[in-house]
Design a protein with these regions (language model features):
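Interfacial helix-loop-helix hairpins and adjacent transmembrane helices
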Residues: 1-17, 415-437, 466, 472, ...
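Signature of alpha-helical transmembrane segments and their immediate interfacial
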Residues: 2-36, 440-442, 510-562, 602, ...
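Extracytoplasmic/periplasmic membrane-proximal domains and adjacent transmembrane bundles
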Residues: 8, 39, 50, 118, ...
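Transmembrane helices with small-residue packing motifs
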Residues: 14, 21-57, 115-124, 381, ...
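Hydrophobic transmembrane alpha-helices and their membrane-interface caps
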Residues: 26-32, 37, 318-319, 346-415, ...
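Flexible hinge/switch segments at interdomain interfaces of large molecular machines
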Residues: 36-46, 83-89, 124-148, 177-183, ...
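Solvent-exposed, membrane-proximal periplasmic/extracellular interface segments of envelope transport
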Residues: 60-132, 193-214, 235, 582-672, ...
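Helix-loop junctions and hydrophobic alpha-helical segments within the transmembrane domains
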Residues: 330, 334, 410, 415-448, ...
Length: 1008
């Protein structure tokens, strides 16, 4: 069949050329219109359920809200893990499904389960809401709003009602979360002493205010042949008119709201969170995109919308988009990988020209590159995959191998044409016949060598989870581009050879061999003769090097993925629970000042607390700081160490330092935004926190551990209002009345909405701050008895101070506390091994408590096992492919002896660079084994041809065959190796982090 393909191509040369040009044009067009992203879709199918629970304490939220939701979804079809966090007034449940679950099916399953929960939740709890469908790479843009004279109330209103709707209307946006500033609301602030004076009960106030600002309908009337809609218009946004609403009549005189309360416009209380930019109060707007939406294109649309909005904003309002912009990381990453790809191509050109010394042969070989790459892009596009650093990385790693097939074909055609030209004129064959026979001669080695490399990449496709999502596109891009290069070598390359190499040349035939090729053959022949004369020395030295390399391999550290350089730090600063938002804000400002003192950091933005229905449920004691940076002379690690040093002066604060995407990957893997998570499960939070600190103390001096923290799940101050039931009975006060009194006076109740020029604001009733600002004032609040008399709350209830949990985190319906850590200066697996040893030796857990470990190392161990097993299988398949070609087990085994030689160089490359074996490095070894067998295949195949067709002996065929194939082997090896140099040397640049370990391993292995 391959002969037919070559023959058809040579007989239809114009058709092949036109088809190739059309393919190149179509692929280029597709490349410019394919979605570009930094990584493939890494998100595990996860559905987030969020529930606002008023002012409930964390323990009540856990029992009354979180537990019913967890129970409903736990055990549902496809669910692998359920995590939850219950904080004051808020519940968030993460329902994680198996990786192969369709996200729309997952959301449907959760929605059906939630339908059974609603009736079981308390009346004052909001409806469980599904979070928007997004991903860990979905956070697109953080927009900062600051102002000089505009109030924070007006600034927040602008964000909520002008900017947010405009951004949400942009196609592809999933969510726009606003944090900071003051949320506007209309307030009716009750004064108990005035209510007592006028004899107004709370029930009367609530009866009047509930729905007081809602219009009513009066049906229709017909008059003069017209139909008139009758409306009762009571809705108003005028505070004075609201204040004049009558509550009751006393002795014929009306008592209005303004008589018993302050009616005003104010800021929502309590505040859930606040924000700042460069230490200045701000409003931060976080934009999240929908899945399968182009990041760069959507960012451009959003920035255009913001620029348009800026024209109509107050002059003092500043809009900044440089806080976090994911497209900046994408552009930098893609640009770096593309640069490495281009530079690799230049190295390939240099190698080809040096060895071929002929412009035409170089051009023919290079044509393979663009065609193979555009075919890969077309296949990725029609598979629904994006262009990202992984797919481009696959092409960059393959770029040296893409010209291999063409090199072998062109070199063989060139040699046969030269030999044909040397024949007498009457004995010369037609050019097309020479090209056909020369191409046919190497067709099977070309195809088999390609299949071998493809088989070596098969283990990639057995990876599951996040690592599979990340690395499979790299394998697809590599394999598709490699197959495309083989097809080009069988079709277009012979056609171009017939056109460019088949013309009239000088009498002495085609140009002579290049000087480099002649020089290499001369010296190689000497070395080969010496090696054949000293077989034992060569074998002994090789075995010794292999043993040393094997021993060195087992001393290398192990990690999951290399650290990324995202150009931004994400820093969590957490204080003790129970601290006020104002005090937490002060600590956050100190952290901002310290960060801005670092030269590389030009701006910072901080979120303290959370926004409404925000799945990143941070307490008011936690600040999250985004700190973008630009490296200028110092390395990423040096800047990171200075950040750690600067922030270490914040006494009483726990510091966690990550990067925007990296810490979201960590959170997806273990539920914790750190490399390592020690999960302690139990029932008693105080005991768990004590054990957590014991674990922290036990592992604190482990070499390489950094950012060691215990989750701040500890008790915070509470005020409990506990009814004296016998006194309630004495005064005829029901529990329902008592609960309403506490809720309305303390937390407040939203009784209606106020509509103001297309905007909607809450109308809230609660006690004035002066009457509820301390324990003594709460005791003096007046509750109505059955006769409408005012009774001090202290008569019927105890008001006492106590302690209660601030946050309760759970996993699979079990309370947990996490001791988290990152690594610095040491490999992940060694740090984890030391941690596990310390914990096992020093920690005695009570009955009912247990520890689980989570984080990147789990994925690293699982992926390493998978790759090891599947690599052994791929080696067996490679042996079978070799055996099918040669029908000789010993020859197939000899070719596989290249693998130990390749291992030697790969191991020493790691020893001299990172000193760690990561998943990308393992993949580098796997691909190296496939590439290494290619050269052996070409040699053995040519040895057999010389022995079978020309009757040479073994030694003579080895000498002649090795010299004949030296050029193509050196060209393929050098082009493959040198093309990887840019990736190997620039591993610290954004986008190159994952491909760099692969490139180093392959480069080192090819050299040996």
């Amino acid at each position: 069949m391959l002969n037919k393909i070559i023959h058809f191509s040579l007989q239809n040369r114009l058709l092949v050329l036109v088809a190739s040009i059309l393919l190149l044009i179509g692929g280029t067009y597709t490349a410019f219109h394919t979605e570009v992203d930094v990584f493939p879709d890494l998100n595990a199918p996860t559905v987030v359920v969020m529930t606002e629970a008023g002012g409930m304490a964390a323990e009540e939220v856990e029992q009354l809200v979180t537990f019913p939701i967890e129970t409903a979804v736990n055990g549902a079809t496809g669910v692998r893990r359920v995590r939850s966090s219950s904080t004051t007034g808020f519940s968030v449940v993460w329902v994680e499904f198996y990786w192969d679950t369709d996200i729309y099916l997952a959301r449907q399953i959760v929605s059906e389960k939630l339908a059974t929960v609603g009736e079981d939740l308390p009346d004052n709890v909001g409806n469980p809401t599904l979070g928007p469908q997004s991903s860990i790479l979905g956070e697109l843009l953080i927009v900062g709003l600051t102002a000089d004279s505009t109030s924070m109330l007006d600034l927040r209103t602008l964000a909520d009602w002008t900017i947010r709707p405009r951004l949400l209307s942009t196609g592809g946006v999933a969510q726009v979360a606003v944090l900071g500033g003051d949320i506007k609301e209309y307030q009716i602030l009750l004064h108990p002493e005035r209510m007592k004076h006028y004899g107004v009960t709370l029930g009367e106030v609530m009866a009047v205010t509930r729905g007081m600002n809602q219009n009513t309908n009066g049906g229709v009337i017909y008059e003069y042949g017209n139909e008139y809609i009758v409306r009762g218009v009571v809705s108003t946004d005028n505070v004075r008119q609201m204040a004049r609403s009558v509550v009751k009549t006393v002795d014929g005189a009306p008592v209005t709201l303004e008589d018993i309360a302050d009616v005003q416009v104010g800021a929502q209380q309590p505040k859930l969170g606040l924000a700042s930019e460069k230490g200045k109060p701000a409003v931060l707007i976080t934009v999240t995109k929908q899945p399968n939406t182009g990041t760069i294109e959507l960012t451009e649309k959003l920035e255009a919308a913001l620029k348009d909005l800026q024209k109509n904003l107050p002059a003092d309002v500043k809009v900044s988009t440089d806080i976090f912009r994911q497209s900046r990381f994408i552009e930098s990453s893609i640009g770096n990988v593309q640069e490495s790809l281009y530079e690799g191509a230049i190295f390939v050109v240099i190698v080809l020209f040096l060895f071929l010394a002929n412009t035409r042969t170089t051009i023919i070989s290079l044509v393979t590159l663009p065609l193979s790459l555009v075919v890969a892009i077309l296949v990725l596009h029609y598979m629904g995959l994006s262009i990202n650093t992984m797919s481009l990385g696959g092409m960059a790693i393959a770029i040296g191998s893409l010209v291999d097939d063409a090199i072998v074909d062109v070199e063989n055609v060139w040699k046969h044409l030269r030999e044909n030209r040397m024949l007498p004129a009457g004995e010369r064959k037609p050019v097309l016949d020479v090209v056909f026979h020369a191409s046919r001669e190497v067709r099977m080695p070309i195809l088999n060598s390609t299949l071998i490399i493809v088989v070596s990449f098969i283990p990639l496709f057995f990876l599951s989870g996040m690592e599979g999502r990340m690395l499979v596109p790299l394998g697809i891009a590599f394999i598709v581009s490699l197959f495309a290069s083989t097809v080009v070598a069988l079709t277009l390359t012979p056609v171009l050879c017939s056109y460019l190499l088949g013309g009239d040349f000088k009498k002495n035939g085609l140009p002579k061999e290049a000087f480099v090729a002649v020089w290499m053959k001369k010296h190689y022949e000497r070395g080969l003769l010496w090696a054949l004369e000293h077989k034992r020395t060569v074998l002994g030295g090789t075995i010794a090097l292999f043993i040393v390399a094997l021993g060195a391999f087992f001393t290398l550290g192990h990690s999951f993925l290399p650290p990324f350089n995202e150009g931004s730090f994400t820093i969590n600063v957490s204080s003790l629970p129970g601290i006020s938002l104002e005090e937490s804000d002060k600590i956050g400002r100190q952290a901002e000042e310290l960060l801005l003192a670092i030269p590389e950091i030009k701006t910072v933005a901080r979120k303290t607390g959370r926004a409404e229905l925000d799945e990143h449920a941070l307490g008011v004691n936690v600040s999250e700081i985004e700190a973008p940076f630009e490296l200028d002379g110092r390395s990423h690690q040096e800047v990171l160490e200075e950040v750690r040093h600067k922030l270490s002066v914040l006494t009483g604060a726990n510091i966690e330092i990550g990067q925007p995407i990296s810490h979201r990957i960590d959170a997806m893997l273990s539920g914790t935004q750190a490399n390592i998570a020690i999960k302690l499960f139990g029932d008693d939070l105080n005991k768990m926190f004590s054990l957590g600190n014991q674990i922290k103390e036990a592992v604190s001096d482990v070499e390489g551990i950094a950012d060691l923290n215990v989750e701040q799940q500890i008790e915070r101050p509470e005020l409990k209002i506990i009814p004296r039931r016998e006194m309630l009975a004495k005064y005829g006060i029901s529990l329902a009345q008592f609960n309403e009194f506490v809720t309305v006076n303390m937390a407040g109740e939203v009784v209606s909405q106020v509509y103001e020029k297309g905007k909607s604001f809450n109308l809230v009733v609660r006690a004035a701050e002066d009457n509820r600002g301390s324990m003594e004032r709460i005791k003096d609040l007046m509750i109505d008895d059955a006769q409408g008399r005012k009774i001090p709350l202290s008569y019927v209830a105890r008001v006492e101070s106590s302690m209660g949990p601030n946050t309760i985190n759970r996993e699979n319906v079990k309370r947990k506390i996490v001791i988290s850590a990152n690594t610095s200066g040491r490999d992940l697996r060694s740090v984890v091994n030391d941690i596990q040893t310390r914990v096992n030796e020093k920690i005695q857990l009570p009955e009912g408590y247990h520890i689980e470990y989570g984080g990147q190392f789990e994925s690293e161990q699982a992926a390493s096992r998978t790759l090891l097993l599947t690599s052994l299988m791929s080696i067996v398949v490679i042996f079978l492919l070799l055996y099918m070609q040669f029908r000789n087990a010993s020859q197939s085994g000899v070719i596989l002896l290249n693998l130990p030689l390749a291992l030697i160089g790969g191991v020493f490359a790691l020893l001299c660079t990172t000193g760690e074996v990561s998943i990308p490095a393992i993949i580098g070894f796997i691909s190296l084994f496939g590439i290494a067998t290619r050269n052996g295949t070409l040699l053995i195949s040519h040895y057999n041809t010389l022995r079978d067709e020309q009757g040479m002996g073994l030694r003579e065929s080895i000498l002649r065959g090795s010299l004949d194939r030296l050029n193509p082997i050196l060209m393929t090896a050098l082009s493959s190796a040198l093309a990887l140099i840019p990736l190997a040397l620039r591993g610290g640049l954004p986008g190159n982090e994952i491909q760099s370990p692969m490139a180093k391993v392959i480069l080192g292995g090819l050299l040996t």
